[in-house]
A protein has these predicted regions:
Chain A
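A short glycine/serine-rich beta->alpha loop
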Residues: 136-142, 225-226, 268, 310-316, ...
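Conserved active-site and cofactor/substrate-binding residues in soluble primary-metabolism enzymes
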Residues: 40, 71-75, 83, 118-122, ...
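Short Asp/Glu-rich motifs
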Residues: 99-100, 176, 349-350, 422, ...
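Active-site capping/gating regions of soluble enzymes
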Residues: 216, 232-241, 260-442
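Catalytic alpha/beta active-site cores
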Residues: 1-266, 271, 290-293, 297-304, ...
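Flexible, glycine-rich loop/tail regions that form catalytic "lids" or insertion modules at the edges
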Residues: 6-33, 43-45, 94, 353, ...
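Generic secondary-structure signature for well-ordered alpha-helical cores
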Residues: 86, 129-133, 155-163, 197-209, ...
Length: 537, 140
């Protein structure tokens, strides 16, 4: 575990990719089996789900943003939309994500820190003020309280007179990976799965253009999983949701069209491209072969991508701009439907307007200057890329089999098996960085003792934001119709006890009555209890 | 981890350490990696799991008779939460238990945390061996 002897000595290029896949020096034409590849827009969609790639429609440029109060975040959203961003991505603070009202002692230190505080409908009204919800799509990184935030979005659309059917956007709503990494779980696994099925089944009818789930590998990836493991865990989780929805009587030809996915892209270019191409092909095959899905649209693997995350480092932070550019190219070559590029300072602070703008410009340069978006799947047919895609797919399938053999992903999570496995993997990754085997330029290789690690402009949260949130919270509690709140919460509690009910209409009623996120969560906890975290290492 | 003697490989042998996640931050992989590394270095590690109150963490530290508490915070709430844990330890007459912090800690906040009595601040880029060695020196 010693540091590299000289940080300026060039390391050897390895023969194995970070996903553990053998990478030959030379790959010949015999490595490619054209029958496995297919054409763009055709099964098995190795080359993308659309025949015209990005010519028909560019990916959505969607930057994750939100902090402090709804007023401040609304201002940042308008700034980003003015810069040519084409969708919103709402970052919510931890109290909102974990289901605590701002006044709760657990919530107080966290108000507005990692996202905006959204405790009730009155805050949503401020957050989306002056933004045309029928014209833009809005994505929410929300899981434990996803059903509640979705209900709040519908309620605010109702208030603004926007027809629900016109709403587009996404709620992450993927609780399984929260138990493994990221940690904003609230309820035990089974009632959480019910809540997710409720949102998907309700959304398919009420908001048919909305993605009621974004099954995410991003967080396990950032926590230590390889690209192959990220895809394998995500597909396994996806299948668990599919099985649950079928059990609830959902029509797979219908709900499968609105399942979407979400990944991190890190720095190993071909692992990433291969991961995305292999995942798309594997999902289509699973839909068609395992579930006999006939409609090609219900076989489509649509996904968003984040570039950056834990691949960004504090050492020489401006280098991160280049990392994000490389990663964005991999996301485009992999055929992403939406891309979020991290700002170069995002690994350690909320981005400033300066760094946030560079992140948007990076996508625009790749979209409109580089030319790589002109041709669909420009790497398709490359001897190496097709071979690496095949090997990646085999590796993903192998990991999925291991999970199956353990007893399925739900059991693996409830037992803490997957969590422990991920922690071991994270330790291995850290050791490889410490020894210099994994190269991070400017950190463990090619660094100088006197190098500059300052980020330049430092973002400062307004220290009074939390107090303003608390004042607004108290005001709404004092002015709302308390009897209507109590009545609607009671109806919600009763419906939660009955598995045949879909909870969405009850949650929307609660939101309209200005019930708070904390009140709705407390009502559901009374029925379902809380998740008991397995903490064994 | 290569080492010439047993002691060098396990410099934290005999030490008991709580690794804790105060507040609502769910990013626990750093805490788990540190917990595994400290365990491999010979320490007995008690990992609390997510979303623990400062009072709970202090209570566990006292009940388990630990030498040190490591707090992992990536949500930006480190100043408030560390102050609360330090306070909670003092309230239990356990102000002598040493407090360490890891996570996303801006350089500007280091002095503020040290003035609360924090004995070491670690970020994800620090090699684990360095973390272990520093900790071993601090805990004597």
């Amino acid at each position: 575990m010693n540091a590299p002897e000289s940080p300026l000595v060039a390391p050897q290029l390895t023969q194995t990719s970070p996903s553990g896949i053998d990478v030959p020096v030379r790959v010949g034409a015999d490595a490619v089996d054209p029958s496995r590849i297919g054409a763009p827009g055709e099964f098995p969609f190795t080359r993308g789900i659309f025949p015209d790639g990005y010519r028909g429609r560019l990916w959505t440029i969607r930057q994750y943003s939100g902090f402090g109060t709804a007023e401040e975040s609304n201002e940042r959203y308008r700034f980003l939309l003015d810069q040519g961003q084409t969708g919103l991505s709402v970052a919510l603070d931890l109290p909102t994500q974990c289901g605590y009202d701002p006044i709760d002692p657990m919530a107080r230190p966290e108000i507005g820190k990692v996202g905006v505080s959204l405790s009730n409908l009155s805050e949503a009204e401020i957050l989306f003020k002056g933004i045309d919800l029928a014209a833009i799509s809005t994505s929410f990184t929300i899981n434990g309280t996803a059903a509640i935030v979705y209900a709040m979005y519908l309620a605010v659309a109702d208030k603004l007179g926007v027809p629900r059917a016109k709403l587009t956007g996404t709620i992450q709503n993927d609780i399984l990976k929260e138990y493994v990494a990221r940690g904003t779980w609230i309820f035990p696994v089974r009632p959480s799965m019910r809540l997710i099925a409720d949102t998907i089944l309700f959304s398919n009818d009420a908001t048919p253009r909305f993605n009621p789930i974004s099954i995410a590998g991003a967080h396990v990836r950032d926590a230590g999983a390889t690209a192959a493991e990220e895809m394998a865990y995500t597909l396994a989780n996806g299948l668990a949701y599919v099985d649950d929805l079928k059990r609830r009587g959902g029509d797979i030809e219908k709900f499968a069209k609105r399942l979407s996915f979400f990944f991190y892209v890190h720095m190993d270019f071909f692992d990433e491209v291969a991961k995305l191409r292999a995942g798309r092909r594997l999902w289509a095959r699973l839909m068609k072969e395992r579930y006999a899905v006939a409609d090609p649209k219900a076989q489509h693997f649509r996904f968003g991508v984040v570039c950056g995350g834990s691949s960004l480092v504090a050492a020489q932070p401006y280098n991160n701009i280049v990392r994000v550019a490389v990663e964005t190219m991999a996301a485009v070559m992999g055929g992403a439907q939406s891309i979020f590029t991290c700002a170069f300072d995002e690994a350690f602070q909320i981005p400033t307007e300066f760094s946030a703008e560079i992140a948007v410009r990076t996508q625009q340069m790749i979209a409109y200057e580089s030319g790589i978006a002109r041709t669909v799947d420009p790497l398709g047919g490359s001897y190496f890329v097709e071979q690496h895609t095949d090997r990646m797919e085999a590796s993903i399938e192998g990991i999925m089999r291991e999970i199956d053999e353990y007893g399925g992903v739900v059991k693996a999570i409830e037992d803490g098996w997957l969590q422990a496995r991920l922690a071991e993997r994270a330790l291995e990754r850290k050791m490889r960085i410490d020894t210099g085997e994994t190269v991070i330029v400017g950190q463990n290789h090619f660094r100088r003792e006197d190098q500059k690690n300052e980020v330049g402009e430092v973002f400062r949260l307004d220290p009074n934001a939390a107090n303003r949130v608390l004042e607004k919270y108290q005001r709404i509690r004092d002015t709302r119709d308390a009897a209507a709140v109590a009545k609607n919460l009671a109806r919600l509690g009763k419906a939660a006890a009955d598995e045949r009910e879909n909870l969405m209409p009850y949650l929307i009623d609660c939101c309209h009555a200005y019930a708070t996120v904390g009140e709705m969560v407390a009502t559901l906890k009374e029925q379902w209890g809380e998740f008991q975290e397995p903490v064994g290492l | 981890m290569k080492a010439t003697t047993q002691d060098a490989a396990t410099p934290l042998r005999g030490k008991r350490i709580v690794v804790a996640k105060p507040g609502l931050d769910g990013h626990d992989i750093g805490a788990k990696v540190i917990a595994l590394a400290l365990r491999d270095a010979g320490a007995e590690v008690i990992y609390t799991g997510l979303r623990k109150t400062p009072e709970h963490i202090a209570r566990v530290a006292v009940d388990e008779g630990v030498d040190a508490v490591g707090l992992s915070i990536l949500s930006g709430s480190h100043r408030e939460l560390v102050a609360q844990v330090v306070q909670a330890l003092k309230a239990l007459d356990a102000g002598d238990i040493k407090v360490f912090v890891g996570g996303t800690i801006p350089a500007d906040d280091v002095a503020a945390l040290e003035s609360l009595g924090v004995r070491g601040i670690y970020t994800s880029e620090q090699p684990l061996q360095e973390v272990v060695e520093k900790l071993a020196r601090e805990l004597g």
